[in-house]
Amino acid sequence: MKFNFITLFPEKIKSYYSEGLPGKAIDNKVVDLEILQLRDYSNNKHFKIDDTIYGGGAGMLLKVEPIDLALEYLGESKGTVILLTPSGKTFTQSIAKDLADKRNNITFISGYYEGVDHRVTENLIDVELSLGNYVISSGDLAALCVSDAILRLIPGFLGDFEGSLKDESHNEEGILEYPQYTKPAEYKGWKVPDILLSGNHSEIQKWKEANRKKLPQ
């Protein structure tokens, strides 16, 4: 499985995937990584990848041609093509699991400025995804969030800790984990619930189930 990123800021992607668990996943070939600088696929002598909007409108749009040429370069290895945009379908854990289970290559296209030429959406991608009902300055942030959520569900990512996914802090049903505590048992009068200190595993399990929370819809 391979993650491809089409971006204006390759160093952001490289930096994220060179550290911590994502970096180890790349080193251990859990997934392969390819990062394309979008400007490399511009036919403009100034490497221009955006332009003004037909019909008027504020801001600039990413042009269709550089994105198309980048995808042509990837060829069959592009796999599922995802455009990160505020207008896309809201990304969820169940979508992450579905994409991880398919084991297909994934290409992430980061949006910037006012977005992309709509011909990209109509002809070149498989799905638009959004982190939520808000706008951020760079699609790279969204691409990293989505790719990380998918990556951590791929076997081998957590190594010896794979079993912890069964007790995950958030699963595809939208259930959050129960409250968790560590030492000390009391701090500034704030106490860990007595049941968690009791050693009664069956009662502790009941407490955990009773205190799981549902994500707001």
What feature does the model see in each segment?
Residues 116, 120-163, 170:
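Structured adenosyl-cofactor binding patch, chiefly the S-adenosyl-L-methionine
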